[in-house]
């Protein structure tokens, strides 16, 4: 069973059809199980509501996640501790990776499940998390 942890950045890129979205979609589809931290679901909701500000946008987001078979994973105390440690090691203002709050929860979920992380950008490659796509694959798309 191939579990894939999905970061907020990957969902945003898919929803906005950003460059490389096709490769992200292929990776997402290839996984037998896709998971998103509930902390990242809230982050996605805040981003969507901040840009569009209506309930229909949030309903669209939830339908997309359901259609993509992305399951929510609750944050427990051990995972929260890993997220806190991720900030101390890789957080904004502390490390070139510059992980933000949501990034720390994606990192923690990937580490907890020992699963690759699907994301967009150069932040997570500067950490010790397993990555689902190399940056050059993102750039080629």
Listing of model-derived features with the role each one plays in the protein:
Residues 1-36, 49-63:
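Short, well-structured N-terminal submotif of metal-dependent ribonuclease cores
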Residues 3, 107-141:
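Acidic, PIN/NYN-like endoribonuclease modules and their adjacent C-terminal/linker elements
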Residues 11-12, 41, 124-125:
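A generic structural signal for short hydrophobic patches within well-formed alpha-helices
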Residues 35, 71-73, 132:
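General small-molecule cofactor/ligand-binding pocket signal
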Residues 51-55, 90-92, 134-138:
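Short, hinge-like loop/turn segments at secondary-structure boundaries
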Residues 71-116:
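Active-site neighborhoods of divalent-metal-dependent phosphate/nucleic-acid chemistry enzymes
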